[in-house]
């Protein structure tokens, strides 16, 4: 089986994709790190050392624009490749995974007409009560034209998005059932082996943990309690 391609914009996305890649045949898989990931170069070196992935660094800020007119998608793709220094060979990968298809890299996938799988950008994000970005996009006047490939659509609505992942596909009403797939990050993190935990520590811990952690505070990036994903206890 061919290796997979994982495109990451945050450390959380790197974490879950590293673990998923480690459980898939075809290693080493390719992981594209956006320059938005903190301490990108040092993190890439630690990721490469695992043997699970080989990293590619892409600075999306080098291509912040868009192209319109005849063959716009082809010209936009060539501009991205020239300025950002990376070119996708879709035939080399089994699956292409991205968490943020509204990004420059996401638009590049659409310009390449590359079938991709949209992953949740944060834990359980497809199950949140506020999905106005998707619903507003679908009521826009140019939505039908963009569905035919004239422009970009995001958050799983692009015709080049082949599947959408959810923590629980049965509870997600944003897309038709045939496009949804369940990929539970909670189950993934709960099932880590000792070897996987050691790999995560080697990649993400840059200094030893304190022996005494009394009074330590855990800062969560969103309200897991309000989302019903964590209890107060």
Regions inferred by a protein language model and the residue ranges of each:
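Short secondary-structure capping micro-motifs at structural edges
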Residues: 84, 206-208, 232-233
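Short glycine-rich anion-binding loops that position phosphate/pyrophosphate groups of nucleotides
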Residues: 102, 223-225
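Generic structural motif recognizing short loop/turn segments at the entrances and edges of beta-strands
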Residues: 1-4, 27-29, 51, 170-171, ...
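A nucleotide-sugar donor-handling region in carbohydrate enzymes
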Residues: 127-217
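A short, charged/proline- and glycine-enriched loop
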Residues: 1-4, 91-93, 209-218, 222-223
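Donor-nucleotide binding loops and adjacent catalytic segments primarily
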Residues: 211-212, 225-233
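General structural signal for secondary-structure boundaries
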Residues: 10, 177, 192, 230-231
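Active-site and donor-binding regions of nucleotide-sugar-utilizing enzymes
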Residues: 5-156
